Amino acid sequence: MTDETYMRRALELAEKGAGWVSPNPLVGAVIVKDEEIIGEGYHERYGQLHAERNALAHCTKSPKGATIYVTLEPCCHHGKQPPCTDALLAAGIRRVVIGSKDPNPLVHGKGIRILREHGVEVTEHVLEKECDAENEVFFHYMQTKLPFVILKYAMTLDGKIATYTGASRWVTGEAARAHVHRMRNRYRAIMVGVGTVLADDPMLTCRLKETENGANPVRIICDSKLRTPLESQIVRSAKEIPTILATCNRQEAMHMPYIEAGCKILVTPEKDGHVDLSDLMQQLGQLGIDSVILEGGGTLNWSALQAGIVQKVQAYVASKLFGGTEAKTPVEGQGFHTLSLIHISEP
């Protein structure tokens, strides 16, 4: 089998850590000796063994002289775990095949250099594009210290997210909704506007099948004037599921009922009557929140695009037609006045 074949297996393993290792990267590793896979591993939980050490621990025979395929450059510094380069050298690994170079300045090329200095053959850039995509959140956060924001919405064939009366359940079917819950498991936080809370009273939790493990995202409500009802499901469950209210309201007396209910309050400057989303992203990044699913209505979505905080758009299109000039669309507001302001890159 080829290097690409083994690296694809390492990518499959890396994916198993989705939702559990943030803010660490997703990493998978496969150890091969005499064209036989003798060990596999992935980074399973934040703070626990890295993929390389897990793969070494699961070897069915001595890894001395073997090749390890790892989706991300092995670390070479002491964090919650010791350097993986040390483990690979101690195990006698002969060759290391790497997908992505680690953007962490504590590593970035240093792990590769250490291995080569000790006589280990290193092959880089194998399925690099796929490995980079697997860790797009980690790469973005490591380079900017801002959350990676994905704008998600479901719409009809004629581009509507709700009827003119506001009815929106359900635009899409079960398959799309199941995919959304897998996204919620993968991303660190989910953000909506207060209008969504007032209209739908959602829980914004991760509901996966019993056979899957689901981690609830941090819930963020953009509520400039603090109109979120104290009796809403989100506020009532805030002591069990981390919940943030982002507001422009600086009156501490109005903050207290939410704080007592378990919510965290983040105050931003006001921008056009709304929460300053750029400032909010700075604060979320400082809290270690590396990724956000934006499930807002048309107004919040437009504000996010206008603020330039969105890195990716995920659209689900249903085979339905709502019609109506008053029906809600995914992006409202004034809109861009010229095509030259619109820049979209395809994956």
Regions found by a protein language model. Give the residues of each.
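A broad detector of short, well-ordered amphipathic alpha-helices
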Residues: 8, 12-15, 39, 50-53, ...
